[in-house]
């Protein structure tokens, strides 16, 4: 990724944490897919898998790489990136660097005359802001693709007067499509705004905050590269790249209520709040286009929550971190799916394919 696009870097640890292994042969392990019974080997070989890691009781019990990917290779995470932002906001709130009830414009005054004038940090965290923003990946002219063009993902959409930075793009959004906290509507721009609010609140580059408060604490084995705009501001809505093992450590942290390697990284009450949501969160999720597709789910703090003990971080082309606190299981799947997962011609073997087309 760094050879094609501008990126910023998170550095690996000088003393990396190595997850212990207890490898099992799980090829024939059966489970219920969307089209009936399947097994792990069939799922892996038919769902464009690049990397797949299972942890049980904090040990790696299965690890496999396909399509010439190796354990030290970095993979585009797409929207899995968002969950790192959500957890960092919780850390900064505990450190009193910001308050999730505050309006975004308190930290980003350039948004005073934009669609985000009344949007709070929490509204952005929960994807309930008022801004009109199409996340339709199938529409080449949607706002999602115009934002992605800022980091050169769609150079064909860039014109002489196009925004040069993500901040400029955000400030140019003027229209709203709903009231604040009226309905859940998934929009990548909200994650990028959160990253900028974090940066402004600490007067420190976002990538440095992520390095200090999360990446260093996870004792990462490998670097992470994040696609960035011309100002070196990272495209955190979808642009982070990391190894499967380092993502597994992030999953372990979530599984252990924000703790990793005997250190509390994310506040325990932030994880608790994420998992529990509220009646209002569940109601506005149910009223959204996602409600019928994901019954019982809610979305809070940039995490998809299936029940009070299960969290999912997910990217649209087959990237996911699945966290099951009750059973002490973490699963990382990194894929290069050719289709949006929800519209995939063969989604039966990938639980993430239950997700709608904007993730």
Question: Each predicted region: which residue ranges?
Answer:
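Conserved small/polar residues in nucleotide/adenosyl-binding loops
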Residues: 342-349
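Short, charged, amphipathic alpha-helices and their helix-cap/turn boundaries
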Residues: 60-64, 105-106, 140-179, 204-223
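N-terminal leader/targeting segments and the immediately adjacent pre-domain N-terminus
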Residues: 1-70, 97-98, 125-126, 130-132, ...
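Active-site helix/loop module of the DD-peptidase/beta-lactamase fold
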Residues: 76, 95-136, 172-175, 189, ...
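Hydrophobic alpha-helical segments, chiefly the membrane-spanning helices
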Residues: 353-359
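Active-site SXXK
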Residues: 58, 76-100, 124, 194-198, ...
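Active-site-proximal alpha-helical segments within enzyme catalytic domains
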Residues: 127, 189-197, 239-259, 319-335
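Active-site Gly/Thr loop motif
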Residues: 220-227, 275-330
């Amino acid at each position: 990724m760094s050879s094609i696009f501008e990126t910023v870097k998170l550095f690996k640890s000088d003393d990396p944490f190595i997850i212990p292994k207890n490898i099992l042969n799980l090829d024939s392990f059966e489970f219920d897919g969307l089209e009936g019974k399947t097994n792990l080997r069939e799922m892996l070989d038919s769902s464009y898998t690049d990397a797949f890691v299972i942890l049980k009781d904090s040990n790696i019990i299965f690890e496999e790489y396909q399509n010439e990917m190796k354990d030290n290779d970095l993979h585009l995470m797409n929207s899995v990136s968002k969950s790192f932002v959500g957890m960092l906001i919780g850390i900064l709130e505990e450190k009193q660097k910001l308050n999730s009830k505050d309006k975004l414009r308190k930290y980003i005054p350039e948004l005073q005359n934009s669609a985000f004038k009344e949007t709070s940090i929490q509204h952005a965290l929960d994807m309930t802001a008022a801004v009109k923003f199409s996340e339709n990946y199938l529409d080449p002219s949607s706002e999602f693709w115009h934002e992605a063009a800022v980091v050169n993902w769609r150079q064909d959409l860039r014109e002489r007067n196009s925004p040069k930075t993500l901040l400029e793009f955000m400030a140019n959004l003027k229209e709203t499509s709903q009231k604040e906290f009226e309905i859940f509507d998934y929009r990548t721009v909200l994650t990028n705004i959160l990253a900028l609010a974090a940066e402004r609140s600490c007067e420190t580059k976002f990538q440095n905050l992520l390095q200090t408060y999360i990446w260093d604490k996870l004792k990462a084995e490998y670097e992470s590269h994040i696609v960035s705009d011309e100002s070196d501001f990272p495209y955190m809505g979808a642009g982070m790249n990391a190894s499967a093992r380092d993502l597994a450590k992030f999953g372990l942290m979530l599984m252990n209520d924000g703790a990793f390697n005997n250190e509390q990284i994310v506040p325990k009450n932030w994880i608790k709040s994420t998992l529990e949501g509220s009646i209002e969160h569940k109601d506005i999720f149910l009223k959204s286009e996602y409600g019928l597709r994901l019954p019982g789910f809610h979305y809070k703090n940039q995490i998809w929550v299936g029940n009070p003990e299960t969290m999912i971080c997910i990217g649209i082309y087959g990237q996911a971190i699945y966290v099951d606190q009750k059973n002490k299981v973490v699963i990382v799947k990194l894929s290069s799916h050719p289709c949006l997962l929800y519209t995939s011609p063969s989604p039966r073997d990938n639980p993430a394919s239950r997700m709608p087309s904007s993730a």
